[in-house]
Amino acid sequence: MIDLVNANLLNSLARRLVREGLLDEYQALTAQKDAQQQKLPFIHYLSSTGRINSDLLAYLVAEEFGLPYLDLDTFDTRYLPKKAVDEQLLRKHQALPLYKRGNVLSLALSTPTNLAAIDEIQFQTGLTIHPIIVAEEKLHQMLETSLETDIAALGDLESIELEALQL
């Protein structure tokens, strides 16, 4: 059980992790303090330590913030909206557009408090952003794979154009 002094020091996610038995109070307080000292979002810090399964963490984050959760293992990358968002913004904010419907862009994020990502991407695209919470390590893998595929496709296109010019 969380004592009243420490309960006031823990953020809502940390309290939830203690209630779920995934961390004790001391671990939660220490993790919060370490994340602040390293200037990392609490969720990123927890993911990087490996103390909590990243899928479970993402699910609890989504529940705690009232946002949808998606297991990226179940997502078909063929349907990713290509070129919906500038590659530099995606890398900067570790965000991945999942699908676009009308003027709404569903965006995979591991940290729902990353308001800068939502604001910048919304400004750049002119679309309403619908955040979807995903596991951080899976997001990173899918983002890199997706961007590498785009770069490889551009390389193929350039070689085809050069061959056509040589003919």
Residue ranges and their predicted role:
Residues 1-167:
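N-terminal, intrinsically disordered, highly charged
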